[in-house]
Amino acid sequence: MFNLILWPLFLLTSVAIPLQLTLEVVYLTSSVDFSKASAAKTATSLGQSPVVITIYKSLLKYWSLYEFIHFIYLYTPIDAFLNFLPFTSLLMSFGSICLTRELVYDFIAFMESQNKLTGFLNKITEPNFNSYLLFSSIYNIWFADDTNDKFLFGKLTQILISVTKRYEFPRTFYLAKVSDFLQNLILTRLRPFVTEQPQGDKNRYQNGDRESTKNGAAYQKSSQQSSSFEQNFTSTEFPNDYDFMEDILDETTELD
């Protein structure tokens, strides 16, 4: 009976709301007509919007963690062990709520950077804004037509933002910590397979070195000439402070 109550809450916080935020971000950031916008203006706008990069990274980390837990972790013996522990569903629901709140906070920061929050949403944090005004405002949002609504899901997204801004909790960063931990763990496990060279490849390379001993001097001479040519070419044509992207942007601006 307890799981029947927590399971819808877990689906809402772990799937429905993150999917809603993901589609909202894609919808709001796809309003730029890239066929008409120049490359210089597009790159400049992206470079001046670090909050956009932050929300994309947060969504990528969340869905990567979701895939890892539901399609890799749940098929291991650890899942069978957790089924015998009490309050496992409660802990999973609490964890999904914490991670989803972090996504909502990043989405609110993204909306504030884009200046797309309405006047109602900006008044949520005022001291005289009580719970009665909150629910009455939610009622007005749901049943009143808003011509300035820019959200894909409309009033559902406005209600989600308004409730989150009204009942704020201390900001946490569990999503970034868990994602970095799993990334380091996976890289640590994969590093021996990448750095280790098979014995067959070692023997093959050793035999190849013996056969190419006669041509070693000629190859070394040609490689030295090639290296000197690359150094001279790099020093004359491409200095150390050369930025290829800035060159492209300058040429694109001149064409515009």
UniProtKB/Swiss-Prot annotation:
Induction: Induced in absence of NAP1. Expression is increased by rapamycin, which mimics nitrogen starvation by inactivating the TORC1 complex. The gene is ATG40. Keywords: Autophagy, Endoplasmic reticulum, Membrane, Signal, Transmembrane, Transmembrane helix. GO terms for biological process: cellular response to nitrogen starvation; reticulophagy. GO terms for cellular component: cortical endoplasmic reticulum; endoplasmic reticulum membrane; membrane; phagophore assembly site membrane. Residues 197-243 are annotated as: Disordered. Disruption phenotype: Partially blocks reticulophagy, and the double ATG39/ATG40 knockout almost completely blocks this pathway. Leads to a more densely reticulated cytoplasmic endoplasmic reticulum (cER). It comes from Saccharomyces cerevisiae (strain ATCC 204508 / S288c). The keyword Membrane applies. Interacts with ATG8 and ATG11. It is found in: Endoplasmic reticulum membrane; Preautophagosomal structure membrane. The chain crosses the membrane at residues 68-88. Residues 199-213 have a biased composition (Basic and acidic residues). Present with 1890 molecules/cell in log phase SD medium. Residues 1-16 form the signal peptide. Residues 222-238 have a biased composition (Low complexity). A motif (ATG8-binding) lies at residues 242-245. It is a single-pass membrane protein. Acts as a receptor for reticulophagy. Directs autophagic sequestration of folded tubules/sheets derived from the cortical endoplasmic reticulum (cER) and the cytoplasmic endoplasmic reticulum (cytoER) into autophagosomes. Is not required for the cytoplasm-to-vacuole targeting pathway, mitophagy, pexophagy, and non-selective autophagy. It comes from the Eukaryota. Residues 17-67 are lumenal. Residues 89-256 are cytoplasmic. One of its GO terms (molecular function) is protein-macromolecule adaptor activity. This is Autophagy-related protein 40.
